[in-house]
Amino acid sequence: MIDAESPTTAFRTKPAPVDPSLQHEIEQFYYWEAKLLNDRRFQEWFDLLAEDIHYFMPIRTTRIMRETAQEYSGAREYAHFDDNAQMMRGRLRKITSDVSWSENPASRTRHVISNVMIVDGEKPGEYHVSSVFIVYRNRLERQLDIFAGERKDILRRTGSEAGFELAKRTILIDQSTILSNNLSFFF
């Protein structure tokens, strides 16, 4: 089970195997999501988000062994992102604007998604999903950023062509110091 309150633990125990067709469906959803982001089809990507989306990327700090539970900032603390649908709409408008200096010229990104683990959520048709990612970004001629980490999502089954909507995403990056000039892209 994904621990929604503690970003340091994705699953408390090894998840039970899920139906292979469900595993395939969710992986295909993630590959489609990555394709939309890589191709800068941001409005189509935004359409995959639930109206009650919570998009959260806590700040990571380096801690000694006995303080690892405090490694990531929590709810109601500072975060790189702590966005709802309205804030995400604003980010979408900015990233697609030709006056946004941080994305003009636009970044070239590549999202690699792997290690997808799924457990049933509390409600029918809801799934808690953990996946690992690498996001490669190249901008201008020499700016290169690589981010690695884990995403903890809540997906809901829908009748849409995509089959699911993203209701919650918590992004746990491996870096404690971000060397990138900005975070003007989506994970």
From Swiss-Prot:
Pathway assignment: Xenobiotic degradation; biphenyl degradation; 2-hydroxy-2,4-pentadienoate and benzoate from biphenyl: step 1/4
Key words of the record: Aromatic hydrocarbons catabolism, Dioxygenase, NAD, Oxidoreductase, Plasmid
Pfam families: Ring_hydroxyl_B
Reactions the enzyme catalyzes: biphenyl + NADH + O2 + H(+) = (2R,3S)-3-phenylcyclohexa-3,5-diene-1,2-diol + NAD(+)
TM helices/strands, residue ranges: none
InterPro entries xref list: NTF2-like_dom_sf (IPR032710), Rng_hydr_dOase-bsu (IPR000391)
GO MF terms held by the record: biphenyl 2,3-dioxygenase activity
Induction entry: Transcription is up-regulated by aromatic compounds including biphenyl, ethylbenzene, benzene, toluene, xylene, cumene, cymene, and chlorinated benzenes. Is under the control of the BphST two-component regulatory system.
Record carries keyword Transmembrane: no
EC main group: oxidoreductase
UniProt cross-references to SUPFAM superfamilies, sorted A to Z: NTF2-like
EC number: 1.14.12.18
GO biological process entries: 3-phenylpropionate catabolic process
Family: Belongs to the bacterial ring-hydroxylating dioxygenase beta subunit family.
Subunit structure: Heterohexamer consisting of three BphA1 subunits and three BphA2 subunits. The multicomponent biphenyl dioxygenase system is composed of a ferredoxin reductase (BphA4), a ferredoxin (BphA3), and a terminal oxygenase (BphA1A2).
Function recorded in the entry: Part of the oxygenase component of the biphenyl dioxygenase system that catalyzes the stereospecific dihydroxylation of the aromatic ring of biphenyl, yielding a dihydrodiol compound. Is likely involved in biphenyl degradation that allows growth of Rhodococcus sp. strain RHA1 on biphenyl as the sole source of carbon and energy. Can also use naphtalene and 4-chlorobiphenyl (4-CB) as substrates, as well as some polychlorinated biphenyls (PCB) such as 2,2'-dichlorobiphenyl, 2,3-dichlorobiphenyl and 2,5,2'-trichlorobiphenyl. Exhibits weak activity toward dibenzofuran and dibenzo-p-dioxin.
Protein name per UniProt: Biphenyl 2,3-dioxygenase subunit beta
Organism of derivation: Rhodococcus jostii (strain RHA1)
